[in-house]
Design a protein with these regions (language model features):
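Extended, histidine- and acidic-residue-enriched regions that form the cofactor-binding/catalytic faces
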Residues: 1-107, 113-254
């Protein structure tokens, strides 16, 4: 296995991967979609790629290239947004899972960076319940942000949290304007995005208040995410060590 201060990724050669023979790999999954007028289209990709590198280094895992497209159908109508259909994303995951399993990997951490990638749930469940040699652990890097309450119910997209994280990671890509949500209707809820799309409720493409963002907040959020993310992953890797059979406890059946 490579040392923690190195990274087994796409910059390495095939013989280097063969020599390392890792059993654990990380696949970051992002999205290529609008983030209003102040954040780049690749925001989700940049963020999940950063955390993917961090996780791979911490665990001595192989890092697969970030999947830069996700399901972003709720952003239909915004120029630059490129979305996969849910069934396409599911098939891509199936194909990648088959390839890494064939090469000897036994666990793949699927690190999600886009809240709209709901189709990852059923495909991961379907693969895991087959009790194949490969197990997939699905994790979203922003889960701890949601659980901590740092991201309010009105801060869903391109708002305070995402802008703060980008100010910490890539301030050179954050434009000076700070748009905020100007809802076109009252009583709109996040599930309504599946019916009306982002452009209906938020023509400017922001669901939140980016004016509240700061680099300091972003750095604080990143530190918290790193800590919570590794605790979450290590705990579940231990669960997998105890039992890799889907739906069965770690205790032997009598």
């Amino acid at each position: 296995m490579p040392k923690r201060n190195s990274l087994l990724d796409g910059t390495r050669t095939s013989p280097q991967w063969r020599k390392a023979r890792p059993k654990l790999c990380v696949l970051p999954v992002g999205a290529f979609e609008q983030h209003s007028s102040h954040l780049p289209l690749a925001t989700d990709d940049i963020q999940v790629d950063y955390f993917g590198q961090f996780v791979a280094r911490e665990l001595g895992a192989a890092l697969l290239p970030t999947l830069n497209y996700g399901t972003s159908l709720e952003h239909t109508g915004f120029r630059g947004t490129i979305s996969l259909r849910p069934e396409t994303l599911m098939q891509v995951i199936r194909d990648i899972a088959g390839e890494v399993e064939r090469q000897g990997f036994r666990t793949m951490i699927l690190l999600n960076g886009h809240g709209g990638n709901f189709s990852l749930l059923p495909v991961v469940r379907d693969i895991n319940r087959q009790d194949r040699r490969l197990k997939i652990l699905l994790v979203s890097w922003y889960t701890s942000v949601l659980e901590s309450g740092a991201q309010g119910k009105s801060d869903i997209h391109a708002g305070e949290v995402e802008t703060s994280v980008m100010l910490a990671l890539r301030p050179d890509l954050v434009r000076p304007e700070r748009p905020r949500l100007k809802p076109s209707v009252k009583g709109f809820q996040q599930p309504d995005l599946t019916t009306f799309g982002m452009g209906f409720i938020a023509p400017d493409g922001v669901y939140g208040d980016s004016s509240l963002a700061s680099r300091e907040k972003g750095e604080k959020l990143i530190r918290r995410v790193k800590q919570d993310l590794m605790k979450h992953i290590r705990e579940r890797l231990e669960w997998l060590r105890r039992s890799r059979i889907y739906g069965r406890s770690g205790r032997a059946e009598k």
